[in-house]
Amino acid sequence: MQSGQEVVYLHLDDIIPNRFQPREVFDERALKELAASIKEHGVIQPIIVRQVNNKYEIIAGERRYKASALAGMTKIPAIINNLDDKPLK
């Protein structure tokens, strides 16, 4: 993490998946394993998001986001980054 990047805790309901996500399939067993780890240890590495209107779109960390929801979490650590669409395509 670069200096000056603050970690905030966002409600999962305020986060949307990235419409440019190249991964179309998430391995269900691996997600369940990650969810179990998150239940035990929490999310160790924050996801990276950008603000889009009144929501936050995932730039990196969709597996952590999905596993956190599966684990029953309501918030996730995140770093808010101001990117436009170009680097996401």
Q: How should each PLM-predicted stretch be described?
A:
Residues 1-81, 88-89:
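Short, charged/polar connector segments at secondary-structure boundaries
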